[in-house]
Amino acid sequence: MARFPEAEARIFKKYICLRCGATNPWGAEKCRKCGYKRLRPKAREPRGGGR
């Protein structure tokens, strides 16, 4: 992962749409592609485990 704050801000200060998975800017109220209002912050740790 990123080791310094500038890189972490650039990589993780984004929202992901829960409907279509599009990446959106940090200040977004709704998805830029589908208009859905439910957005989650980009995960800082990987999900699952890959098994």
Curated annotation (Swiss-Prot):
This is Large ribosomal subunit protein eL40. It comes from the Archaea. Belongs to the eukaryotic ribosomal protein eL40 family. GO terms for molecular function: structural constituent of ribosome. Coiled coil: none annotated. GO terms for biological process: translation. Keywords: Ribonucleoprotein, Ribosomal protein. The keyword Signal does not apply. InterPro entries: Ribosomal_eL40_arc, Ribosomal_eL40_dom, Ribosomal_eL40_sf, Ribosomal_zn-bd. HAMAP family: Ribosomal_eL40 (MF_00788).
